[in-house]
Curated annotation (Swiss-Prot):
One of its GO terms (molecular function) is ribonucleoside binding. The gene is rpoB. This is DNA-directed RNA polymerase subunit beta. GO terms for cellular component: chloroplast; DNA-directed RNA polymerase complex; mitochondrion. The lineage of its organism: Eukaryota, Viridiplantae, Streptophyta, Embryophyta, Tracheophyta. CDD domains: RNA_pol_B_RPB2 (cd00653). It comes from Solanum lycopersicum. It comes from the Eukaryota.
C-alpha cells in the first residue's frame, strides 16, 4: 500500500496479474467463443449429424502436482470434456456422450505454464490495430500524395490513394490499382447507390468516362475487372462461381475481416454507426474512407501517427491461446468429418466417442508452447527475472516486425508510452526498442489497449477518484507530471506545475490541471523502479542496470540493500520465491523440508523448496524463518527464498567501496577486490547442474545400467552403487562415471582377436559384446551429488525410454574473471584479488572491499551511484535502511544531496568519526595505502553501495582445447566452448604477433594449429619419436579454399616456392 500526503492510499497491482487474468479470460470466454463456432458436421448423404453442446464443458483438475510435472518432464495440464451428440435424421434418434477432446496446459498464479517439464511463459505482443490510417508522402515531383491504409484483423493491407486530379484508386497489389468505383461495384453497389452514399459525388463523377462506365456497367464486369487487376491475369477471363470463390478466399477474407476492434476503430474514425457484430469491411466503409481522403486532400482532417499507442493493440496470452484452440477445433472438425464418412462407407455404427480423438488439441498446444516465437522458456536466474519476463511486450513475432526491418521511429520512445510502457527498460542489441516492459500500474483494457491510472482533480469533490485511461483518451486532459505530487494546497497564490497535453509538455497553473499521476514510479517497469536515485543517471546506464539486475546470481548469504526504493518487498512477494501462510494458525513443526501449520481443526503441510535447480543452473532454496509454536496470520511470510531476506528482494551485498585508481588494475572497468570477499564467502553462490542419460531398447536388446563396466579403471567407478548409479553425497571429479551403461552390439567372429577366440574355444569364456556408453562428468563439472532421479515415462510400454538424472551442486567463490555490477550500469570484471593488508584502508582501520575506477562516472553520467555509495555508508554506521522514491527534487532543490549530507553528518556525530563528513570535501575521506601505510594524495569517495554478482562467470566461459573437431570446408578448429572449439587467429591477432616479431609462433598458429592438414598429422608422429617438426612445404587449406573461390570467379591465382640455395622456382598446385 503506497500513499502520498495529498490523497488516499493506492495499491500496487500484482506484477503477475496481467498474465494470470489473460489466462482466466481465455478459460471463461475464449473457450466458449471457439466452441460455439464449431459447426454441425453431416455425412455425405446427410443422414447423420454431429454437434457439440457447449453449455456443459468441464475442465478436470490435474492428477499430478506442479513439482512432479517438472521432475518427470510432463505437462501440467487439464483434461477438457464436452458433451457431444450424434443425431440420426431419419429416425430423429440422438446419442449423447461426454467426450474427451484433449489437454489444455494450465497456468499457475505466477503466470507460467509447465510443458514437458519446462517452465514456459507467453509474451504479450504489440500489433498495429486493425482499422484505417491516413498518411502523406512526397512523390518524385515533391507533391504530397495522401493514402489511406486499411489493416485487417489478419494483418492484410489495402490502400486507397488520391492523385493530383483527385481521382481515388484502390491498390490491390504492389503494382496494380483499380478505380474506387470498380471496387465498390464489385462489392455489390451500383453507380446510383455509390453517389448517394458519398459526400463529394461531383468528384466521383469527374473521372467517370465511358471506359469506367463499361467496367461498372454490371457487377459481373466489375468483378472480372477486379480479378484481372488483382491476379494480374491477361486475356479475357470468364465470370464463374469458382472465380468469385478464389477472389473471396485470396482477397476479401484476408484483407476485409476487421474483427471487433477493427470495426470499433473504423466507426470512430469515419463517424459510422455500423453494428459491432458486423466485422467485415463493407462498401459503406470504403466510400466513407474515400470521403475522408478527399477531405485530407483539401486540408480538412488530420493525419494519423502510426506509432501512437492508440493505434496499437495488445495481443495477450488470452488471444494467442484462443487462436490455437480455434486452430485445434478446425483440425478436429476435419478428423470428425473423415471418420464419419469412413464409418458410413464401412457400414459401421459411429458413436461420439469414436469420432473424436484428443491428439489435435494436445499436439496443437504442445507445438505452440514449443515452437511459437512468443512462447519462451522462463528465465529463472533470480526472483526478479521471473517477474520481469512475464511483463515483456514484443513488437516481434508472427504478424509483427523483425529486428532487421524495424525503423528508428518505431523503436523510439513515444509520448503515449507515458505510464504504459517503460521508457528505460528494453533489450540491448538489434532488438532495442522492439522489446519493452510494462509500467508498474499499466493494464490491458477490454479493447486490447494499454491503460494507465490517473487521479482526477475536481473542485466540486474533495475525494479522490482514480481513472484508467486508454492512450487516446488522456490527450484531451491536462496531466500533471511527477513533481506536482508535493503541492501545498494551503498556499493560496497561483502555483505553476509541468503538465502534459496533446503529446506536448507544458508549464501551466495548478487550477488548469485535470489529472495527475498516482505514483512516482508510474512511468517505470519493475527493473527500473528498483534503481535508487534513478533521476541522476543517464537513461542508457539505467537501461543497463535494469537488465543486469535480472542477471544477478542468488548468493549463499543474501543481504538486503541499505539504500532501496521500497518496491523490493512487492517484487519478492509476487515472484513466488517466498512461502506465505494461506490461513491463520500456529506452527506445530518445522524442518528443512516442510512447515506444519495447525488451524481450523486440521494441519496444513507447506512444502519448502530445497536446493532446486533453475534453468540457468542457479540454486533455488527456501529457509524457514518462523519458530515452532508461533501464531501467525494469513499472508505472513513463513520462509525466505533464494535472493530474499525478511521478505525483501536481496540480489547482492553491501560492500565497502573506494573510487580511486590502483596501479592500473581497475582501468577500463576492471575491479580490484579484497580476499575477504573470498574467505568469508561474501560473494559465494551455489550452482546446480543437471546431467541425464537415457536407456533404450535396441534391436540387439535392452541397454543395461550396471556398475560392472569392462576396460575402465576402478577409480572412475568408485562412486557407483550396486545398480550402477552414482551415490548421493559423492564428490565427483571430471571424467568420473555418473551412470554405468552398456549397449549391446553385434560382433562378427572374424573381428575377435586370436587370443579371444582361443579363450572362447578352450575355456568357454564369453568375451563382452557390449559397448560402454556411460554418463561421464564433463570438464568443469566437479561438485557434490545432491539428487539422483530414475524416471520412466508414464504409459507402461517397454519401449518408453527410461531417464536417469544426476544433479550436482557446485560452490563457487568469486574469482578473477567474474563479472560484478552495481545498480546504476556500473559493471566490471574482477582483475585482481589483493590480500587484505594490501588493500587501501580507512581512518578507523577497516580495509576497503572493492576499488572502482573513478573515470567510469563522469563520462557515463550515472551519478546516482555516488549518492547511493555515500548514503549506504551513513546507513551502515547508523544501522538504518533507506527507501527513497525517485524524483525527490519535487520537494525541494538538491533534495538528494541534502539528504545524503545530513545523514553523513549525523553518522559522523553519532560515531564520533569526523572523517565520515568533512566539510572541505563532503562525501570524501583521506584513506591510506595498505602496502606502505602512507595516505593517498587526494581524498577519495568511499561508501557502501549494493553490488551484484552476475551470472557471467569465468568458470562457464574459460576453455582450452588439446584436440577436437575441424570444420569440413576450411579445416580450421570449430568455434565455441560447446563444440570443443579452438583458437581462431584473425588479422588483428596476426598484426599483434608480427609486431613482436615472433615468426615461428605465427607460423604455428597459421599452419600446425589451424588448417594445414598434412603438417598437423606429421606433428603427432615427430613428437612421439622425439624428432624435429618439419616446416610445411605447401599452402594451408584456407589458402587453397581462397584459390578455389577465385577460380569460381574466373580468376587464376598461382603461388611458387623459391629455393634458398639456387633460387629455383618450384611451382605447387593449390
Amino acid at each position: 500500500m503506497l500513499g502520498d500526503g495529498n490523497e488516499g492510499i493506492s495499491t500496487i497491482p500484482g506484477f503477475n496479474q496481467i498474465q494470470f487474468e489473460g489466462f482466466c479470460r481465455f478459460i471463461d470466454q475464449g473457450l466458449t467463443e471457439e466452441l460455439y463456432k464449431f459447426p454441425k458436421i453431416e455425412d455425405t448423404d446427410q443422414e447423420i449429424e454431429f454437434q457439440l453442446f457447449v453449455e456443459t464443458y468441464q475442465l478436470v483438475e490435474p492428477l499430478i502436482k506442479e513439482r512432479d510435472a517438472v521432475y518427470e518432464s510432463l505437462t501440467y495440464s487439464s483434461e477438457l470434456y464436452v458433451s457431444a451428440g450424434l443425431i440420426w435424421k431419419n429416425s430423429r434418434d440422438m446419442q449423447e456422450q461426454t467426450i474427451f477432446i484433449g489437454n489444455i496446459p494450465l497456468m499457475n498464479s505466477l503466470g507460467t505454464s509447465i510443458v514437458n517439464g519446462i517452465y514456459r511463459i507467453v509474451i504479450n505482443q504489440i500489433l498495429q490495430s486493425p482499422g484505417i490510417y491516413y498518411r502523406s508522402e512526397l512523390d518524385h515531383n515533391g507533391i504530397s500524395v495522401y493514402t489511406g491504409t486499411i489493416i485487417s484483423d489478419w494483418g492484410g493491407r489495402s490502400e486507397l490513394e488520391i492523385d493530383r486530379k483527385a481521382r481515388i484508386w484502390a491498390r490491390v497489389s504492389r503494382k496494380q490499382k483499380i478505380s474506387i468505383l470498380v471496387l465498390s461495384s464489385a462489392m455489390g453497389l451500383n453507380l446510383r447507390e455509390i453517389l448517394e452514399n458519398v459526400c463529394y459525388p461531383e468528384i466521383f463523377l469527374s473521372f467517370l468516362n465511358d471506359k469506367e462506365r463499361k467496367k461498372i456497367g454490371s457487377k459481373e464486369n466489375s468483378i472480372l475487372e477486379f480479378y484481372q487487376q488483382f491476379a494480374c491475369v491477361g486475356g479475357d477471363p470468364v465470370f464463374s462461381e469458382s472465380l468469385c470463390k478464389e477472389l473471396q478466399k485470396k482477397f476479401f477474407q484476408q484483407r476485409c475481416e476487421l474483427g471487433r476492434i477493427g470495426r470499433r476503430n473504423m466507426n470512430r474514425k469515419l463517424n459510422l454507426d455500423i453494428p459491432q457484430n458486423n466485422t467485415f469491411l463493407l462498401p459503406r466503409d470504403i466510400l466513407a474512407a474515400a470521403d475522408h481522403l478527399i477531405g485530407l486532400k483539401f486540408g480538412m482532417g488530420a493525419l494519423d501517427d502510426m506509432n501512437h499507442l492508440k493505434n496499437k493493440r495488445i495481443r495477450s496470452v488470452a488471444d494467442l491461446l484462443q487462436d490455437q484452440f480455434g486452430l485445434a477445433l478446425v483440425r478436429l472438425e476435419n478428423v470428425v468429418r473423415g471418420t464419419i464418412c469412413g464409418a458410413i462407407r464401412h457400414k459401421l455404427i459411429p458413436t461420439p466417442q469414436n469420432l473424436v480423438t484428443s491428439p489435435p488439441l494436445t499436439t496443437t498446444y504442445e507445438s505452440f508452447f514449443g515452437l511459437h516465437p512468443l512462447s519462451q522458456v522462463l528465465d529463472r536466474t533470480n526472483p526478479l527475472t521471473q517477474i520481469v519476463h512475464g511483463r515483456k511486450l514484443s513488437y516481434l513475432g508472427p504478424g509483427g516486425l523483425t529486428g532487421r526491418t524495424a525503423s528508428f521511429r518505431i523503436r523510439d520512445i513515444h509520448p503515449s508510452h507515458y505510464g504504459r510502457i517503460c521508457p528505460i527498460d528494453t533489450s540491448e542489441g538489434i532488438n532495442v526498442g522492439l522489446i519493452g516492459s510494462l509500467s508498474i500500474h499499466a493494464r490491458i483494457g477490454h479493447w486490447g489497449s494499454l491503460e494507465s491510472p490517473f487521479y482526477e482533480i475536481s473542485e466540486r469533490s474533495t475525494g479522490v477518484r482514480m481513472l484508467y485511461l486508454s492512450p487516446g483518451s488522456d490527450e484531451y486532459y491536462m496531466v500533471a507530471a511527477g513533481n506536482s505530487l508535493a503541492l501545498n494546497r494551503d498556499i493560496q497564490e497561483e502555483q505553476v506545475v509541468p503538465a502534459r497535453y496533446r503529446q506536448e509538455f507544458l508549464t501551466i497553473a495548478w487550477e488548469q490541471v485535470h489529472l495527475r499521476s498516482i505514483f512516482p514510479f508510474q512511468y517505470f517497469s519493475i527493473g527500473a523502479s528498483l534503481i535508487p536515485f534513478i533521476e541522476h543517471n543517464d537513461a542508457n546506464r539505467a537501461l543497463m542496470s535494469s537488465n543486469m539486475q535480472r542477471q544477478a546470481v542468488p548468493l549463499s548469504r543474501s543481504e538486503k540493500c541499505i539504500v532501496g526504493t521500497g518496491l523490493e518487498r512487492q517484487a519478492a512477494l509476487d515472484s513466488g520465491a517466498l512461502a506465505i501462510a494461506e490461513r491463520e494458525g500456529r506452527i506445530v513443526y518445522t524442518n528443512t523440508h516442510k512447515i506444519l501449520l495447525a488451524g481450523n481443526g486440521d494441519i496444513l503441510s507447506i512444502p519448502l523448496v530445497i536446493y532446486q535447480r533453475s534453468n540457468k543452473n542457479t540454486c533455488m532454496h527456501q529457509k524457514f524463518r518462523v519458530p515452532r509454536g508461533k501464531c501467525i496470520k494469513k499472508g505472513q511470510i513463513l520462509a525466505d527464498g533464494a535472493a530474499t531476506v525478511g521478505g525483501e528482494l536481496a540480489l547482492g551485498k553491501n560492500v565497502l567501496v573506494a573510487y580511486m585508481p590502483w596501479e592500473g588494475y581497475n582501468s577500463e572497468d576492471a575491479v580490484l577486490i579484497s580476499e575477504r570477499l573470498v574467505y568469508e564467502d561474501i560473494y559465494t553462490s551455489f550452482h546446480i547442474r543437471k546431467y541425464e542419460i537415457h536407456t533404450h531398447v535396441t534391436s540387439q536388446g535392452p541397454e543395461k545400467v550396471t556398475n560392472e563396466i569392462p576396460h575402465l579403471e576402478a577409480h572412475l567407478l568408485r562412486n557407483l552403487d550396486k545398480k550402477g548409479i552414482v551415490m548421493l553425497g559423492s564428490w565427483v571429479e571430471t571424467g568420473d562415471i555418473l551412470v554405468g551403461k552398456l549397449t549391446p552390439q553385434v560382433v562378427k567372429e572374424s573381428s575377435y582377436a586370436p587370443e579371444d577366440r582361443l579363450l572362447r574355444a578352450i575355456l568357454g569364456i564369453q568375451v563382452s559384446t557390449s559397448k560402454e556408453t556411460c554418463l561421464k562428468l564433463p570438464i568443469g563439472g566437479r561438485g557434490r551429488v545432491i539428487d539422483v532421479r530414475w524416471i520412466q515415462k508414464r504409459g507402461g510400454s517397454s519401449y518408453n525410454p527410461e531417464t536417469i538424472r544426476v544433479y550436482i551442486s557446485q560452490k563457487r567463490e568469486i574469482k578473477v574473471g567474474d563479472k560484478v555490477a552495481g545498480r546504476h550500469g556500473n559493471k566490471g570484471i574482477i582483475s585482481k584479488i589483493l590480500p587484505r593488508q594490501d588493500m587501501p584502508y580507512l581512518q578507523d582501520g577497516r580495509s576497503v572491499d572493492m576499488v572502482f575506477n573513478p573515470l567510469g562516472v563522469p563520462s557515463r553520467m550515472n551519478v546516482g551511484q555516488i549518492f547511493e555509495c555515500s548514503l549506504g555508508l551513513a546507513g551502515s554506521l547508523l544501522d538504518r535502511h533507506y527507501r527513497i522514491a525517485p524524483f525527490d527534487e519535487r520537494y525541494e532543490q538538491e533534495a538528494s544531496r541534502k539528504l545524503v549530507f545530513s545523514e553523513l553528518y549525523e553518522a559522523s556525530k553519532q560515531t564520533a568519526n569526523p572523517w565520515v563528513f568533512e566539510p572541505e570535501y563532503p562525501g570524501k575521506s583521506r584513506i591510506f595505502d595498505g602496502r606502505t601505510g602512507n595516505p593517498f594524495e587526494q581524498p577519495v569517495i568511499i561508501g557502501k553501495p549494493y553490488i551484484l554478482k552476475l551470472i557471467h562467470q569465468v568458470d562457464d566461459k574459460i576453455h582450452g582445447r588439446s584436440s577436437g573437431h575441424y570444420a569440413l570446408v576450411t579445416q580450421q578448429p570449430l568455434r565455441g566452448r560447446a563444440k570443443q572449439g579452438g583458437q581462431r587467429v584473425g588479422e588483428m591477432e596476426v598484426w599483434a604477433l608480427e609486431g613482436f616479431g615472433v615468426a615461428h609462433i605465427l607460423q604455428e598458429m597459421l599452419t600446425y594449429k589451424s588448417d594445414h592438414i598434412r603438417a598437423r598429422q606429421e606433428v603427432l608422429g615427430t613428437t612421439i619419436i622425439g624428432g624435429t617438426i618439419p616446416n610445411p612445404e605447401d599452402a594451408p587449406e584456407s589458402f587453397r579454399l581462397l584459390v578455389r573461390e577465385l577460380r569460381s570467379l574466373a580468376l587464376e591465382l598461382n603461388h611458387f616456392l623459391v629455393s634458398e640455395k639456387n633460387f629455383q622456382i618450384n611451382r605447387k598446385e593449390a
